Every structure is written in C-alpha cells, then in structure tokens.
A protein has these predicted regions:
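Active-site-adjacent pocket-lining segments in enzyme domains
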Residues: 1-115, 119-131
Length: 132
C-alpha cells in the first residue's frame, strides 16, 4: 500500500510496470537498502548481509535494521521469532553507536541461552562506552 517509507518507491515502480513501462534505474534509498539487507539476513544470507553492510554502511540505516529486530523481540511469543529478531539486532549492532541496542542484544542472547555471546556483546559495549 506504500504506507511505509521504504515500500513507497517499490509500489510506485510496480505501478509503472503494471502500466507497461519500465521504471528508471536508480540506487535504492537507504531505508529500502536496509530492509533488503534485513530480508536477506532472515532468508539465511546473514554473512552476505553483514558483508554488504560493512562494505557500504553509508548506503544503509543500521538503526532501522536494529529497531526492526528489537520490535520483533518485544512482540515475540516463541524462541524462533526471538532468534529471527536476534539475527537483525546482531547485524546492526556493530554499526549503531548508541549502546542501548547492544545492551538489548545481550539481554536477548542471554534469554536464548547464548551466554558467551551475551558476555562478548557486553564486553564490546564496555570497550566502546566505558561509562556504562
């Protein structure tokens, strides 16, 4: 329906195609590129998504990926959904300067029984933000 900013251009391009025309080639906007990475990560292409984000962080909004994971974690009713949320949060954390996402990631890792990963995440927060 084009209600989300990152889907508006895709809807517009679909309409152009439905009218028998070809949309002009363009680079995806940062929000679109971020959602494309999230889709890839959730489809099992985590390493490829991680590599793409690391190669061009300026073309993405890692905060958007991270908050998508955070909201999925908050709404999760089972561990399968929590793991999907964690995938997104872990993808974003290295690129989000605020410590809150990393702290929430560590909390979710611990909740899922990934104690070593939680400890590693917290240690990284302390290195980047010793005031915490």
């Amino acid at each position: 329906t084009g209600q989300n900013p990152y889907s508006t251009t895709g809807v517009a391009e679909a309409i152009v195609r439905a009218l028998g025309r070809e949309p002009v080639a363009r680079q995806p906007f940062r929000d679109e590129a971020s959602m494309q990475l999230a889709v890839r990560a959730l489809a099992g292409e985590v390493d490829a998504a991680r590599t793409a984000l690391a190669a061009a962080p300026e073309r993405h909004l890692p905060q958007l990926i991270g908050i998508l994971g955070y909201y999925h974690a908050q709404a999760a009713t089972n561990d399968a959904v929590r793991r999907r949320a964690l995938t997104l949060m872990e993808l974003a954390v290295p690129h989000v300067p605020q410590p809150r996402l990393a702290l929430e990631t560590a909390r979710l890792q611990q909740q899922l029984g990934e104690t070593a990963a939680a400890r590693q995440t917290l240690e990284a927060v302390l290195q980047r933000h010793p005031e915490h």
